[in-house]
Each structure stands twice: as structure tokens, then as C-alpha cells.
């Protein structure tokens, strides 16, 4: 049975005070939560969050990493820096990194490799734009994104990778993906992995990252191939985030 995972992506939000309040509120409501819960926080707050979560069931993650160990890369953060703050997870290939910072499939695959080689679990984000879906290229785009990773690290590595499907066209656009649309793409992703190794495909958790919220979380996670969510805006509100965690 695959593990249900709820990962919060705070993006470039919060403050020192807000971080303290949000984490404490989440921790206070975790008693009945059975899923694995991860919060991926801005780099400046990682030490603060590490101290707050302690040995609780709340897991710390980062939002990106640089493939280099160190050097003249102003503004970047290495995998060792991330691990210094107790993080065990890192988001890789988020749609905003792909679109705003021009990270292509090869760069994303390299980041996955660096994370795995340094005992961090990558949350590999994949997904298509509106024009891709409208032109019937969803499967083609998603296939290329996954294939780049398989080509570099191999199918067996997916035992240690969490996949997150982001339908970019359904994030902050007012367009909503139906549970069936989400399930169809999740099933396709799993079938692609199965072409290489059926066992790996069955144990790989595939999260949904298309504006999951307390209203649609249960219906989405009732779908056969949806194993949790990568949560954006709703992860900044403790009660909303906890409702999603408990919906699983």
C-alpha cells in the first residue's frame, strides 16, 4: 500500500512571526493525522522551523537546490546547506522554476540526481501548460519530463522519489481540473513507470498539485492513483492545511 503524503509548499510567503504561529498551529492539530506531512519553507526560516518541529511527525523540506556543492553561485543554496537544517525533502522541477527560471528537463533531472545522491527525497514536479492540454499534448509533455529523469537516474531510483503532478493550467487560473482529469493523468504517469518496472510503479507515491483545498481534497484523494497532495496557498492556513491532511 502506498503512503499518503501531504506536502505544503509555502513558496515565497510568511515572516519570522507568521512562521512561528503557523508551525505551532499545525503541530497542535496533528494528533489525528495519519498521513506523512511535509512543509517546504523558504530558506531563511529553515533553522526556525527545524527547532519548532523537533522530533514531531512534521517533516521539513526545502523548495529547491543547486546542483553544485559550493562555489561562486550567488543566491543559491547547496544540498549540504539544506541538510544542515535537518531537511529530508526537497521540491525539484516546480512549474514556477521551470517557467520563471527556465529550468529544462535536463536541469531538473540533474537536481533529482543530486538530491538522491545526498540522501534527500526529491518531490519531482511534472505537468503541462494550458496550451499543451488544449492541443492534446498532456501525455507527451509529462512523458518527456519523466523520461529525462529515468534516463539519468534509472527507474529503480523512483523507489526514493515522490512525484507531484501539477496541471499548470489549473493553478491560479480559475480553471478547475476535475477529479477524473487528475486521475487520468496520474494513471498515465503510473503506467509509464510500469513500462519499466511494475513494482516500482505500484509503490511510487504520486501527489496532486493542482490547487487542492479542504473542499476538494477528499474527492481527489479517493481516486485510485492519487496518493496525496502538494499544497500551495492552503498550506499557509493551518486549519485548511490540517483539514486536507485529515481528508487523506
Curated annotation (Swiss-Prot):
EC nos: 5.3.1.1
Which residues are responsible for catalysis?
A: 94, 166
Give GO cellular component annotations, separated by semicolons: cytosol
**Annotated metabolic or biological route of this protein:** Carbohydrate biosynthesis; gluconeogenesis; Carbohydrate degradation; glycolysis; D-glyceraldehyde 3-phosphate from glycerone phosphate: step 1/1
Gene Ontology MF terms: triose-phosphate isomerase activity
Q: What class of enzyme is it?
A: isomerase
Protein localization = Cytoplasm
Spell out where the chain crosses the membrane.
Answer: none
User: Which proteins does it associate with, and in what oligomeric form?
Assistant: Homodimer.
Functional note: Involved in the gluconeogenesis. Catalyzes stereospecifically the conversion of dihydroxyacetone phosphate (DHAP) to D-glyceraldehyde-3-phosphate (G3P).
For this protein, the record's HAMAP family field holds: TIM_B
The protein's name is: Triosephosphate isomerase
**The gene coding this protein:** tpiA
Amino acid at each position: 500500500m502506498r503512503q499518503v503524503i501531504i506536502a505544503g509548499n509555502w513558496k515565497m510567503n510568511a515572516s519570522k512571526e507568521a512562521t512561528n504561529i503557523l508551525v505551532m498551529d499545525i503541530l497542535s492539530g496533528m494528533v489525528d493525522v495519519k498521513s506523512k506531512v511535509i512543509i517546504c519553507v523558504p530558506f531563511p526560516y529553515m533553522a526556525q522551523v527545524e527547532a519548532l518541529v523537533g522530533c514531531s511527525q512534521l517533516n521539513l523540506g526545502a523548495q529547491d537546490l543547486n546542483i553544485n556543492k559550493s562555489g561562486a553561485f550567488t543566491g543559491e543554496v547547496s544540498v549540504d546547506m539544506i541538510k544542515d537544517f535537518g531537511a529530508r525533502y526537497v521540491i525539484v522541477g516546480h512549474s514556477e522554476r521551470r517557467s520563471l527560471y527556465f529550468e529544462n528537463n535536463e536541469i531538473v533531472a540533474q537536481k533529482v540526481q543530486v538530491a538522491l545522491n545526498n540522501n534527500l527525497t526529491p518531490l519531482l514536479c511534472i505537468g503541462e501548460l494550458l496550451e499543451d492540454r488544449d492541443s492534446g499534448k498532456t501525455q507527451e509533455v509529462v512523458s518527456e519530463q519523466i523520461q529525462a529523469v529515468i534516463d539519468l537516474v534509472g527507474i529503480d531510483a523512483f523507489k526514493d522519489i515522490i512525484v507531484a503532478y501539477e496541471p499548470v493550467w489549473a493553478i491560479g487560473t480559475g480553471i478547475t481540473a476535475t477529479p477524473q482529469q487528475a486521475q487520468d493523468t496520474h494513471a498515465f504517469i503510473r503506467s509509464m513507470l510500469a513500462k519499466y518496472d511494475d513494482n516500482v510503479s505500484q509503490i511510487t507515491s504520486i501527489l496532486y498539485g493542482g490547487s487542492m483545498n479542504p473542499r476538494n481534497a477528499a474527492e481527489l484523494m479517493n481516486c485510485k492513483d492519487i496518493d496525496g497532495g502538494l499544497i500551495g496557498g492552503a498550506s499557509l492556513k493551518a486549519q485548511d492545511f490540517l483539514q486536507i491532511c485529515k481528508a487523506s
